[in-house]
């Protein structure tokens, strides 16, 4: 296993890692790609809590680790706007960002995503925006393609089957990166660990996309390599669950209403996130023992509930000398866990 060579080594099998492999193999059908992840392949991921309702603290956590990351059990909401989800326009501009979003969306459709896109009725969007403005709330228009939890799994599995069957892509489950190898200022491989054995893989390039579960590893790695980084905002809040009747005047037109409010006293940015009409609230546990909440909804109407849930988040941007917003978020989550005795009556959600 030592000293194998791949054109690209991808650390992390979440959406970023998967799409890296899809694009590379489209550009070069002979490209040899190795994707590693600390979790299992998509067909082997099993979360006991989804059956029993009780987390047994599996290691690695089947909810956040493995092929497709946390997306395997998410409800697959694709936000088709550069106005949400990050700062991509800071790097490539509005026009190119829109083109890339459309391209990524087309790939999801190639693998079986649903045809319906919500939030395209401009007249209704304008009416809702007008009503929001009366309360100093900004509505961020954003078309949404909703796959549903069951279809999201099927789409991500189809990507897995395509890559390992039709391309020169290899997926290694239960494998971690110990160290990225750099020579002459260029990443050219990594020291990996699988089943207690360390081995070296050489690669033409390395893509590090470990997701939330690998944030600590990535932070440690870039510091060791002397890479300068900038922290994004940290969003901390609660997940709210209400009857559908309270939110359906928004969700039946937008599916997910993305709203932003700035508080009067300190002008804190407060926003809605991850809205799930007819959805369910789920419990997740990170490997550091923190219990958190998430939400999802099914595409199948028969599996819809009578409730809508969404996260209500406050954004905080830290400056020097504090430079570890993830630790801050984890600390708040731990306090929430402590106050509830580990139960999810109230829980912080870290984004």
Question: What spans do the regions from the language model cover?
Answer:
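Residues forming the flavin
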Residues: 2-85, 123-126, 130, 135-351
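Dinucleotide-binding Rossmann-like beta1-alpha1 core, especially the glycine-rich loop
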Residues: 58, 66-118
